Amino acid sequence: YGQRRHPKKLTPLAYKQFIPNVAEKTLGASGRYEGKITRNSERFKELTPNYNPDIIFKDEENTVMNQWPGVKLRVTEGWDEDGHHFEESLHYEGRAVDITTSDRDKSKYGTLSRLAVEAGF
């Protein structure tokens, strides 16, 4: 089956750097806004829960643990319905997530951002 690929060096993202290099709400980044999902909407059933024990959800990925042993991915915001985001926020559709690390070490955020990009977010 060929040779094993060598892992490429991950370059941390800079503060306020986007991949793709466009704002979150633009078509190139996330597609069209499809409308807010509420608990009573049909689309709510399409959301997929994540029960990964390596992720700490603020409301009580293995790549984070590989990068920093003992540190977990911390999701501070995912799907939301409380109305404190801008009107067409992707949080209301379950297409946006805010993340940190369990140790809240801001020096890791650039690399964390790069890991998210490499994972397809």
Swiss-Prot record:
Keywords: Autocatalytic cleavage, Calcium, Cell membrane, Developmental protein, Hydrolase, Lipoprotein, Membrane, Metal-binding, Palmitate, Protease, Secreted, Zinc. It is found in: Secreted; Cell membrane. Its main location: secreted. One of its GO terms (molecular function) is peptidase activity. It comes from the Eukaryota. Ca(2+) 1 binds at E60, E61, T76, E77. GO terms for biological process: animal organ development; cell development; cell fate specification; cell-cell signaling; central nervous system development; neuron differentiation; proteolysis; regulation of gene expression. Ca(2+) 2 binds at E61, E77, D80, D82. Zn(2+) binds at H91, D98. One of its GO terms (cellular component) is plasma membrane. Belongs to the hedgehog family. Intercellular signal essential for a variety of patterning events during development. Signal produced by the notochord that induces somite patterning, dorso-ventral patterning of the brain and early patterning of the developing eyes. Displays floor plate-inducing activity. Binds to the patched (PTC) receptor, which functions in association with smoothened (SMO), to activate the transcription of target genes. In the absence of SHH, PTC represses the constitutive signaling activity of SMO. N-product is active as a multimer. This is Sonic hedgehog protein. It comes from Rasbora paviana.
